[in-house]
A protein has these predicted regions:
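N-terminal nucleotide-binding beta1-loop-alpha1 segment
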Residues: 459-478
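A short, conserved acidic/glycine-rich loop-to-beta-strand motif
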Residues: 578-588
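Catalytic-core segments of class I nucleotidyltransferases/pyrophosphorylases
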Residues: 555-556, 563, 569-576, 589-591, ...
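Catalytic domains of carbohydrate-active enzymes, especially glycoside hydrolases
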Residues: 93-114, 310, 314
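Active-site region of glycoside hydrolase catalytic domains
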Residues: 2-78, 102, 122, 131-386, ...
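Conserved N-terminal catalytic core of the sugar/cofactor nucleotidyltransferase
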Residues: 459-464, 486, 490-570, 633, ...
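Active-site metal-binding loops of divalent metal-dependent hydrolases
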Residues: 199, 376, 469, 561-562
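Aromatic- and Gly/Pro-rich amphipathic surface segment
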Residues: 72-100, 104
């Protein structure tokens, strides 16, 4: 992991009082001078670990169009009175939208499953609608994008709402049944699951402020809903964990963290209001997950909920802003909230306050489970504020990782402009602009900024040479290509891809030849793998030249009968610093081998000496610029090593690394690799 954050040098233009009038330290409201922040590590791909989850997020009702649920019924009487209607028409433009996600370069996509489509009436199951989500998952995986599925994101069937929804505990089983059936359908391919999105927002907006369906103002009903949502989450988590694939899936709750700061920090009434709202909106929910006892907002006592304690494998954090509190805060959402004089007001009227994301992490750290930023974005119609908003929040996230917070990923809200609940279409959060008349999507400048940061941290395409005959392995490669020979229970190709994915690779190109038809059914659960077969043996160089149309501008080159578990980040750093056309990994301890190097550059290559077991000098992992293939390639049979290495003497860079290089080219070496992998697994 190579992370470079210089947050210790940041200066603060404002830092308010540490404590309220009674002298008890509560929290610091930090305000940073962002003009002093160094964003270079972000831009250069040095701010986040290689396995960091880069994502974008959406919700079904906001983008799909054509839904009939509690929200579509509520919309005519909502504050904006705008109807979701066709929304972004994602239901009919799914494949194109997956292409938009791919173009951003992200590794993950969070979406929600529309319960009302799949169970439009009690006891009815729409398999065609369920299959639509299964097809979405397959399309995402084919592009190397890992799905994260949310089972409840504000919407629910009208028939269930009419029965009282989450107000009645006896209704919970309907949602759990829906969840388990969708889990059974998708969990063989979907690793990440969110049970309920923002239960505090659902409860507050629907049952306290009346801005969401059912549009009531009742603390009593809100308490029932809050309690039953936590019971539903616990029941759902335990049910899913008991199912096939349950133990290998990561299942968690998504909590919106809304910070509350006293408007006047010397005023005890302002502090009282901040503490009260923080307790009701944040602390009671987090404490419930930690202890298993939940005290709903405005309740006097807590109640033990079976299965609640430890019912999240991760905590999803949705963070947008902080609110400044007074005893007379308005309860109408459309009234502008208070802001500090130096803060920027977003289109949603609240301030941009990136510094608060760190406090959100601190608030959930005590759960002792991984943290994922499942939503972070800004309403900004002109896209003037969003680029800086992205940089600031990613900077805060990177600093927290450096300081020891276990933060696994960041999902930008949202992929595209969409139907923003009570605000209708007046608030735009997307990286893609949507013309709601034509449904045309256009990448915004902020989308380019996010994509640039993501791609700077992304690993290049992995290219695997798997076309050789493997004759040294004898009988076993007469009927099985060498890259599909099983080692420790799975093909060596799978081991190679597993390691590459752990290093941050998303896409692989496998060059096949001998028995190439046997690769047709091969799939990897986390990487998009494509195959290119040579009609006749072309040698290592000829195979690359033959596949030149499928090579990306830069790629990592490995051999399909070797396992070389090096740190790709360190190899890439050497390559980028040297600005070389090719950088190869070489062990540090060697003298008179086929490959000689001096001062970090390849000196000569002469394939005459007998290769020493497991040295890997001729075929070590390399990073290659596609231009090398285009400038030196030719038709016919030729060797990459013997041709290119010699021609790049004095130009190719050397990356020194003593990581063992496992060559399974002979039965004896295969046995050594088998033993190594068994020991690694144990």
């Amino acid at each position: 992991m190579s992370i470079d954050c210089k947050h210790k040098e940041h200066t603060l233009v404002h830092k308010t009082l540490l404590s309220p009038p009674d002298g008890r330290i509560m929290w610091t409201e930090e305000h940073r001078d962002w003009t002093e922040v160094d964003y270079k590590p972000l831009a250069q791909g040095r701010a986040f670990p290689s396995d960091f989850m880069w994502g974008v997020a959406t919700a079904s009702h906001q983008i799909e169009g054509g839904n009939t649920n509690n929200w579509s019924a509520f919309e005519p009487g909502s504050k904006s009175q705008q109807l979701s209607g066709e929304a972004c028409d994602h239901w009919h433009q799914r494949t194109d939208d997956v292409g938009l996600i791919k173009d951003l370069g992200v590794s993950h996509y969070r979406f929600s499953i529309e319960w009302s489509r799949i169970v439009p009436a009690e006891g009815e199951w729409n398999q065609e609608a369920a299959q639509w989500y299964s097809d979405l998952v397959d399309e995402l995986l084919s592009e190397g994008i890992q799905p994260m599925a949310t089972l409840h994101h504000f919407t629910q069937p009208i028939w269930w709402e009419e029965q009282g929804g989450f107000e009645r505990e006896e209704n919970i089983h309907h949602w759990v049944d829906f969840s388990t059936r969708m889990f059974a359908l998708l969990s063989d391919r979907v690793e990440w699951w969110c049970t309920i999105n923002e239960p505090a927002v659902f409860t507050t907006m629907g049952y306290v402020l009346g801005e969401f369906p059912p549009g009531v103002r009742s603390f009593k009903r809100a308490r029932s809903v809050a309690m039953n949502m936590m019971k539903a989450h616990a029941a759902c988590y335990r049910a899913l964990k008991s199912m096939e694939h349950g133990e290998k899936c990561e299942i968690g709750l998504v909590k919106n963290i809304n910070l509350f700061d006293p408007y006047r920090r010397w005023n005890p009434l302002h502090w009282f209001q901040a503490r009260l709202l923080d307790s009701m909106f944040n602390r009671c929910w987090i404490k419930g997950l930690k202890t298993g006892r939940f005290k709903p907002p405005s309740a006097l006592t807590s109640t033990a909920i079976p299965g609640l304690k430890g019912s999240s494998d991760f905590i999803g954090v949705n963070y947008y802003t902080h609110l400044l509190t007074t005893p007379f805060m308005p309860t109408k959402v459309e009234i502008d909230p208070l802001i500090r004089p130096w803060e920027q007001r977003t289109d949603f009227r609240y301030p941009m306050y990136a510094e608060g994301l760190r406090r959100a992490f601190e608030m959930v750290k005590g759960l002792n489970i991984p943290i994922i930023v499942t939503e972070n974005g800004v309403a900004d119609d002109d896209d003037d504020m969003r680029p800086e908003h992205i940089r600031r929040h990613l900077q805060i996230t990177a600093e927290a990782i450096t300081d020891g917070f276990d933060i696994r990923g960041f999902y930008h809200w949202s992929l595209m402009d969409n139907f923003e609940w009570a605000e209708g279409y007046d608030q735009r959060f997307g990286l893609y602009h949507v013309d709601f008349d034509t449904k045309q999507r256009t990448l915004k400048e902020s989308g380019k900024v996010y994509a640039s940061i993501v791609k700077s941290h992304r690993r290049p395409q992995l290219v695997i040479m798997a076309g050789g005959l493997g004759t040294r392995l004898g009988e076993m490669t007469k009927t099985v290509p060498k890259s599909l020979v099983e080692v420790n229970g799975k093909p060596i190709l799978t081991h190679i891809l597993d390691w590459a994915h752990k290093q941050g690779c998303l896409h692989a190109l496998v060059l096949t030849g001998h028995l190439g038809e046997q690769f047709e059914g091969f799939r990897h659960p986390r990487m998009a793998v494509k195959f290119h077969r040579e009609a006749s043996p072309l040698g290592t160089g000829g195979a690359l030249w033959n596949a030149r149309a499928h090579l990306e501008d830069q790629f990592i080159l490995v051999w399909g009968d070797d396992f070389h578990p090096i740190n790709y980040t360190e190899l890439m750093n050497t390559h980028n610093e040297a600005e070389a056309p090719l950088t190869m990994c070489v062990t540090q301890a060697h003298t008179e081998m086929n490959l000689k190097h001096i001062n970090g550059l390849l000196e000569s290559y002469d394939k005459k000496q007998e290769q020493v077991d497991l040295n890997g000098y001729e075929a070590g992992t390399s990073i290659v610029e596609k231009s090398v293939v285009l400038e030196r390639g030719k038709n016919g049979v030729w060797s990459w090593e013997e041709t290119v290495y010699s021609e790049l003497a004095g130009k190719a860079a050397i990356h020194l690394d003593n990581t063992p290089f496992w060559d399974m080219g002979t039965p004896e070496r295969l046995a050594l690799l088998e033993r190594f992998l068994k020991e690694s697994t144990s």
